[in-house]
From Swiss-Prot:
Homodimer. Heterotetramer of two MnmE and two MnmG subunits. This is tRNA uridine 5-carboxymethylaminomethyl modification enzyme MnmG. The keyword Chaperone does not apply. InterPro entries: FAD/NAD-bd_sf, GIDA_C_N, MnmG, MnmG-rel, MnmG-rel_CS, MnmG_C, MnmG_C_subdom, MnmG_C_subdom_sf. The keyword tRNA processing applies.
Amino acid sequence: MSSAEALAFDVIVIGGGHAGCEAASAAARAGARTALVTHRFDTIGVISCNPAIGGLGKGHLVREIDALDGLMGRVADRAGIQFRLLNRRKGPAVRGPRTQADRKLYRLAIQQMITEQENLTVVEGGAADLVCDGERISGVTLADGRVLKCGAVVLTTGTFLNGLIHIGEKRFPAGRMGEKPALGLSERLLSFGFTLGRLKTGTPPRLDGRTIDWQSLDMQSADEEPVPFSLMTDRITTPQIECGITRTTPETHDIIRANLHRSAMYSGSIEGIGPRYCPSVEDKIVKFGDRDGHQIFLEPEGLDDDTVYPNGISTSLPEDVQLEILKTIPGLEKAVLLQPGYAIEYDFIDPRELKRSLETRKVCGLFLAGQINGTTGYEEAGAQGLLAGLNAARRAAGSEPVILQRTEAYIGVMVDDLTSRGVSEPYRMFTSRAEFRLSLRADNADQRLTPLADEVGILSKERRKRYLTRETALSHARMVTQSLSITPNLAGYYDLRLNQDGVRRSAYDLLSYPDINLDRLIAIWPELASIDPVTREALEIEAQYAVYMERQQSDIAVMEREERLLIPSGLDFDAISGLSNELKQKLKQRKPETIAEAQRVDGMTPAAVALLIAQIRKFGGRQKLAAETLEGKGAA
């Protein structure tokens, strides 16, 4: 790293968390000479808070990261110690794969992948400043004075950007417990004209599992047949563990109420807004004080680690109050506190400052991913990191960006939400955020996104081969089941109750019936028994949703047409007669590039959209649709 040549890269990624690792890996896979700048190599891939990956909505993101040949799914499969498929009894569209992860195994697995990745160099050091050539990023200055030159930068600072930890009345600068914050970068971002805000998150105390009375607790087991995240994982081999379940008590609540004035959250010390769906225990007691207790999951942090994460009691109360609280919780009366819970505040940038490529609008070549964009969660961060890293590599190479639409992926939904609506609190993914969740299922992420990954050059040969093998098997099974048919009368002999309308139905059609699966059809057509279990499940889900998917495709087509209807860059919003001054101002500030994007501007009504479309036609005549996409303009 001593020569000038060694200090030049195509892409520099700042931060070695979940967003940074995915960004660095994606950029390197895309062929960019990539540097991952982090304070210390041994902190790459650290799970800062909850030792779990996936869940409702989040599991979909992990599957999509994996479909794009990212790291998180494979790493979680190696490190997972309690796999559970959430919403198993509900439809496949809302099922959420989740695993509790061994912190050490997770960190070591991702560090190994980073080390083995071609085109990727880890640079230990702190990023002190961003270097620009006019309005274009050109490098990064490190705290020790080194200057790294580049064509694009991905900033993934997590909670480190002006991070401030709160434990009761105490507060001190930190990125997370025991690590220095990133100072100075906020001032540089402000100098670029970005709008910064403060957000907050928190974490519970860590406990010594040897001092917990496990015998008095209910226990939750892992699934008997763990469902992996990654297409590349044949089966889970890591030992699976149980978690304990306990609850807070009225005595717990009394202690919290009596000490609310000492909580950083309620004393006025914290300015940042916390995540709505991960409230502190103080919030739970204040907002849901009528409940007798709140559930706590006691999650071991590793196979050879006695540390336990009590999921459900995130707090910023003083350490002495935290100790008193533990004494009132069944099973934790004698628990030893290894690390107090705390809240942490950090800077973020209004994500409306970003294009959908995750490149900033103000500085060419500067990309942002993760909590700096106002999101919360490893999965949200990793998904943004992958997209930002890929597009940073493409920016450095002079190629057009990759834009994921809302109709294509949960990643597209998230990025569109962030860049068009912004955030008033930390954003997390739910299946309910997607209009087309029947087609955006966790089980079909590979079908939706792996061909794209192959097209843009970030897919490994091994994954391509495995994907094509699976798709060939599914295509063959589909063809076979569509070629086999039966009359309603004959179906009755096999105890299949169909409308007696005389219409023959294929085996594929029959799989759409709620009480019919492949096992029942094998009695009629024994040759179906040769379909392997993985293909069988995929076929059953596909057939189950086939009718609904046909209906949804028309809705998707409407949205895609709106995504392609471009707003000319020179359109004068002030000239649109009938549009309110408020909307004119918002449109000028937001600068939407398509009608679909304009529709998501706060306050836009159907009448306002009609006025905008009329002005577009007056401005430039008939707009090109499919031929002139966002990518073609390079606007995103």
